[in-house]
């Protein structure tokens, strides 16, 4: 029996609440597909500051090093806002983990469910064609990490990418497309940026190893427009750090709720950190109304990308789709009639059990 070690870092706010539901789903799905999990929990973020004085302790980092993947909740809250910026939970936990494990690829799915078209700001005639997009963003290079200077009269930032950096993120995008609709858009600004010209040259060479993938090019300004005008044309969007940062947030706005958005950050060894895209929402942390779907979908991403358990991941995604189609929703999706956090998790679990028995 295959066994997977997972570092469980629930964090702050709603993190522990929604993490409980994700672990419940993972435990069942592992039994169905005959593999096992070893869940090792540790404090991170504000909870770690309160316990150890730092947002990421050496013990927690060591636990992560001994694991096959990290399932991350959320960190931060007003309680720690008085700390220096570089010591706050958000800055002092997640960013060091990304750097330590060289998590260079960020994957952000965006799917608009048929039962949730009312929650999207897009018109029905746009959504009805289907919206299911994966934004693949390079996370450790580009303009955020280049040389910069801020003077009194001028300032500059430098966008630098190497061939190797582009190649490895391109492989992630093409491999992802293979288990989706086999289409990749490279998002760039090759009409004015030298770095974008290099991206096109390198990606055009990498795609030769993926004859089954359809590669297209699109300028980033046009891509920003097409996301709201004709999003169904996209499958996988391959982006540099800056462009991916902007477009992934635009994608987050069109699906209707942060409670549905999952995220994966990967290195070249298949190790990943999986987390909801939303925040810790401390204002509702003790109300049992947080949407656990983003955390559960993050767990499904872990199954898919770190453990290659694609069918198990698909089962979870299908169960979520069915639950939503049945009108089972949390308060962020339907304020008039809603399930609590644990009830939503139970609903998804019951659908998985019914399909298993069927």
UniProtKB/Swiss-Prot annotation:
InterPro entries xrefs: IsoCit/isopropylmalate_DH_CS, IsoPropMal-DH-like_dom, Isopropylmalate_DH
TM annotation in the entry: none
One cellular-component annotation, GO: cytosol
Marked site: Important for catalysis: 144, 189
EC number(s) stated in the UniProt entry for this protein: 1.1.1.85
Gene Ontology MF term list: 3-isopropylmalate dehydrogenase activity; magnesium ion binding; NAD binding
Highest taxon above the source species: Bacteria
Keyword tags: Amino-acid biosynthesis, Branched-chain amino acid biosynthesis, Cytoplasm, Leucine biosynthesis, Magnesium, Manganese, Metal-binding, NAD, Oxidoreductase
Catalytic activity as recorded in UniProt: (2R,3S)-3-isopropylmalate + NAD(+) = 4-methyl-2-oxopentanoate + CO2 + NADH
Cofactor note: Binds 1 Mg(2+) or Mn(2+) ion per subunit.
Subcellular location: Cytoplasm
HAMAP family: LeuB_type1
Family statement: Belongs to the isocitrate and isopropylmalate dehydrogenases family. LeuB type 1 subfamily.
Summary of subunit composition and partner proteins: Homodimer.
UniProt name for this protein: 3-isopropylmalate dehydrogenase
Organism: Campylobacter jejuni (strain RM1221)
Record gene name: leuB
């Amino acid at each position: 029996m295959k066994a997977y070690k997972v570092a469980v870092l629930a964090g702050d706010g709603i993190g522990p609440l929604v993490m409980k539901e994700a672990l419940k789903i993972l435990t069942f799905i592992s039994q169905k597909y005959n593999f096992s999990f070893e869940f090792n929990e540790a404090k991170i973020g504000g909870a770690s500051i309160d316990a150890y004085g730092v947002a990421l302790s050496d013990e927690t980092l060591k636990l992560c090093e001994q694991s096959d993947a990290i399932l991350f909740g959320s960190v931060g809250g007003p309680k720690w806002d008085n700390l220096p910026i570089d010591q706050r939970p958000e800055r002092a936990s997640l960013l060091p983990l990304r750097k330590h494990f060289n998590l260079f690829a960020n994957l952000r799915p965006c799917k608009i469910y048929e039962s949730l078209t009312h929650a999207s700001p897009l018109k029905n005639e746009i959504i009805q064609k289907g919206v299911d997009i994966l934004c693949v963003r390079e996370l450790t290079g580009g303009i955020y990490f280049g040389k910069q200077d801020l003077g009194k009269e001028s300032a500059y930032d430098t966008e630098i990418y190497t061939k190797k950096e582009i190649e490895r993120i391109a492989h992630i995008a093409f491999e992802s497309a293979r288990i989706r609709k086999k289409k990749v858009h490279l998002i760039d600004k090759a009409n004015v940026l030298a770095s974008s010209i290099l991206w096109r040259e390198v990606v055009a060479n990498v795609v030769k190893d993926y004859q089954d993938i359809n590669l297209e090019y699109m300028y980033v300004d046009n891509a920003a427009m097409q996301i709201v005008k004709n999003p169904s044309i996209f499958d996988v969007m391959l982006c540099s750090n800056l462009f991916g940062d902007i477009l992934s947030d635009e994608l987050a706005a069109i699906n209707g709720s942060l409670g549905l958005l999952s995220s994966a950050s990967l290195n070249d060894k298949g190790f990943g950190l999986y987390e909801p895209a939303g925040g810790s929402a401390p204002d509702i942390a003790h109300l049992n109304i947080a949407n656990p779907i983003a955390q559960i979908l993050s767990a499904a991403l872990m199954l898919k990308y770190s453990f290659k358990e694609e069918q198990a991941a698909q089962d979870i995604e299908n169960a979520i789709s069915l639950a939503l189609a049945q009108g089972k929703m949390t308060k962020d999706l339907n304020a008039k009639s809603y399930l609590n956090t644990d009830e939503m998790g139970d609903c998804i679990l019951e659908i998985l059990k019914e399909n298993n028995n069927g």
